[in-house]
Amino acid sequence: MKADQENLPAGYASLLAEIKDRIRSAQYEALRAVNKELVKLYWDIGRMTTERQATGVHGTAVVKRLAADLQAEFPGIVGFSWRNLFYMSEFFTAYRDKPKLQPLVAIIGWTQNLVILQRCKKPLEREFYLRMTARFGWT
């Protein structure tokens, strides 16, 4: 193995380090894109279920059935429990009339959004933690 390293051209180590950094950067950006799309999906599901519930068409039993049907259709995907569907509705309801907060909730992860939503009951407190999480990556 050491003989192989001796035959490498000058600059190989820096090339390898640069490629590794680029791979890690791409992995991080891909994860951020996936998280952003997941939050958008949960927002949309929350919107759809909230709008149906507002018309009196759906209640707890329907949400539980939705959860069971979604879990059956997408068995490898976590996040479609009836409790999480309720969180999605709560998430949408909390921010639907807050256009300046919507870009913030879109860029932080679902778990971070849930923690802020559940622990911060005052709008200004939520806004503070959303901004700090988005800016500094608080977890």
Which residues does each PLM region occupy?
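Basic, low-complexity intrinsically disordered segments
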Residues: 1-139
